[in-house]
């Protein structure tokens, strides 16, 4: 499962930035090294052909039927067969799996295009296609010398798909061949175009996706196409199970230096521990960034192991693929050292602020969310007067020749971390050995800061009584110059400016989540437990972070403002859940594909939030009413204690513990309401 938590559709638009130009740093030459996938990156037609009429073949959940036309053998430049180029009339039938997954795929196809639902399958027609196979999957087609090969049409097909924002293919094909494993990738000229990937080796998934370029993009916008997944099928597991972990990221050390906007310099050391034998690392990485209608590439100056030896790599398409000098045995450790310049430091909208957000790829991370569980150490240099903030406890905060310098360290493993800097003033207080820091954007807001400090410590103490020890020794509440959302990186809360109004906890403020700023602040504090003490294994289980934080915040709001506020919140959840319940089950909410458009697809975003947050919280509230507060919150505390050190927590883990604690089988209930679309 790829680490793709809500790819911002705003990336489809180039947001003008305020004047902040500076000459970009001159990149140093990257260390020459053979690139994984290089033999498969420039394929050619061999000149051998076969009659395609009546041929059919199956890969994974897909069945291809070639009605008319020709197949032309595709090889590497040294003549190794890797697949075929098809010209003619073909059809694809794709089975999404169980009935709920099939419903979701049909919904996505109707919403996004590319295929139509027929008899429970997705079907599409295509006129040209390229099929690439590892040797383990390659059909026994018989090719023979033929007429003049369609070299130009093949080149045009390759070029058509060359700028798609999709994962690397050539490097994965080499990885599969090296492992003597299965791999298949197809590019289909359809309406709109399709990509089909079957990859049990590096990603344990099969994906059918649409690629298209939306209308209405600004003039001069980079020539690229964007993708949406019609269907994703896990391989070798069910979607209820955690994704396979090949190697786990266990330590991250970063040195961040702000440069002329939008550039900065980063030096990163990452330590991995092999869980299975591995010869390659496939990592998500922000290799390209859209800035003022330009596509700026991350400049990797050096990539070595811990001893400084250069490693072969392939960089691009949002990924870094690293070939290891020798296979890692289970339990073996490897350190990567990276030195790169990156255009991540944009002051979006002209704000006096830049951010390196969680799960954005600003440092390389494994594709599977549950493969990242790392400590974090950061040294950050921000240009004065900007103050920097980062996940972790403060080691030092100093000034050096025009820089404000921050060093932090976090020993508790986390799935991701953040760094940001801006024009902030701070105030803080320490209670029970926990320091809370409030960072006000722009002008100082002393009254709001004092109130937020008081609110934080009050909610924290309540949660410690309810859920157990607070996991952070420091917590920073950072004002974001916007409205309507909150986010909880490790040891931090990013919250928009209505939280810094002096009327906090008295005014009704419009909310993104469910019930205004009161509950939103409590929700974000609850993530210290639900998100970091226990964390969801994959997007199918994201409700463990979000809905559980919702139900905890409900109890906090009841204590702060009375039972009536809790009833209002429960009513909001129920109404939102009813609105979106039929869109998908909760476990498939992150599979709802938004339209490929130059504007925000708000309906899909609302459905996802109402399922993961509202319906999930509604289910937990229903359980609370049935079990009573004592037993319900005892189950939550037991859940936290039982799975604190496990990185692969799933919904079935919670159901099993709930059933044990209550001496009742809750599986049928969750089948209907969590894995199904019914409402309790």
What are the roles of these predicted feature ranges?
Residues 227-266, 273-279, 367-522, 551, ...:
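Hydrophobic helix-coil surface modules that form long, contiguous segments used
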Residues 117-253, 337-424:
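Extended, low-hydrophobicity, Ser/Thr/Pro/Gly-biased non-transmembrane segments
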Residues 354, 371, 457, 462, ...:
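Zinc-dependent metallopeptidase catalytic helix centered on the HExxH motif
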Residues 17-21:
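Boundary at the C-terminal end of the N-terminal hydrophobic targeting segment
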Residues 546, 550-626, 644, 673-677:
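Acidic/His/Gly-enriched intrinsically disordered linker/tail segments
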Residues 6-16:
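Bacterial N-terminal signal peptides
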Residues 276-277, 445, 471, 565, ...:
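Amphipathic alpha-helical substructures
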Residues 37-38, 46-50, 54-56, 60-162, ...:
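A surface-exposed beta-strand-loop module
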